Each structure stands twice: as structure tokens, then as C-alpha cells.
Amino acid sequence: YINRWGLMRNTKNENLSEHSLETAFIAHALGIINNEVFHGSVNAEYLAVLAMYHDATEIITGDMPTPVKYYSEQIRRAYGEVEDIAGRELLTAIPEKLRSRYEEPLLESSWNEEDYRFVKAADKLSAWLKCIEERKMGNTDFYDAECTIQNELVKMQLPEADYFCEHFIPAYTETIDRSGNAATNGE
């Protein structure tokens, strides 16, 4: 398993598989919100597929801590190249007849800007949910990360993410017994 949040004290470890699935669920929801609430036309199912693979290169690279990955534009660019090389390496493990179907999901550099924004927002929302979970367990180590992620989400100016925050995040802050009420009160 590739564990995430390696520089943080975790009350519950989160691995790459768990994060990728949660990100896929959220990306799918953002696509549905785009189509049903904002009358858009994104392919929600395709967003879910991109999100399932969005961190697949970490199978080779490991999880690079976000503060390191985004420390400077030079590091971000270099790491982007590493991710692209890792994605191409993963493609070589797939039978040649199938590679073209995996190329786009595995190579983030081939995504269009709109799909990238939705998956990036889903990734940030998943990270925020991890911070909420840790805070609920009494772990204050995630406080700064939570504030940073909330600010990044606001800066994204993605109405679908704002809608998700307003209508879905409250359920994550409740106990399991109360979460049903939080979800149904959001309309």
C-alpha cells in the first residue's frame, strides 16, 4: 500500500486506493452537479475514470508531499515530468492492443483543462475530507492543511465545488447517526 500524508501524524492511515476511489466518487458528483444544477454537459463518468487514475503514477514515484511538490514552479514542472515518465512506464505494462484506452487516464498532461479542473477540485475535496476526519478524531495536526485546502478550493472558483461544499460537506462533519439528517436538509 502507498500511504498518503506521510509527513503528518494520522489517526487513520489513508492509502492510494482509498483516496483514488473517494476522488472518483467526488469527481463524478461534481460532473453530475455541473450537468443537473448548472446545465453543463461534462461527462461525469469520464471524470470518475480520470480521478480513479489521477495518482496512479504514485505506484512508481510514491506520494510526494504537497508542500514539497508545489514549493516552486521549477519543482512542480520537474515533478510533472517525473509523473509523465511514470505514466508512460505504467503504459508499457499494459498489452499494446489496450494501451490507447489507458493513455489519457494515465497521462494527466493529455487531459483537457475542464476535466483537469474537476478532477483537481475532487482531489482537493478528498484531502479536505481527510482533514475533517482527522479533526473529528481530535488530531489538530491537520488544522493548517485544512485551512490551506479550503483557501485553495475558494481560489479555484468552481461553482460545482462550492455546491458540493454547501450540500455534502456538512454530512461529513456529523456523527454517523446524524449524517442522514445533514444530507436530507441540504436539498
Segments (PLM) and residue ranges:
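Alpha-helical, largely C-terminal catalytic domains
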Residues: 1-187
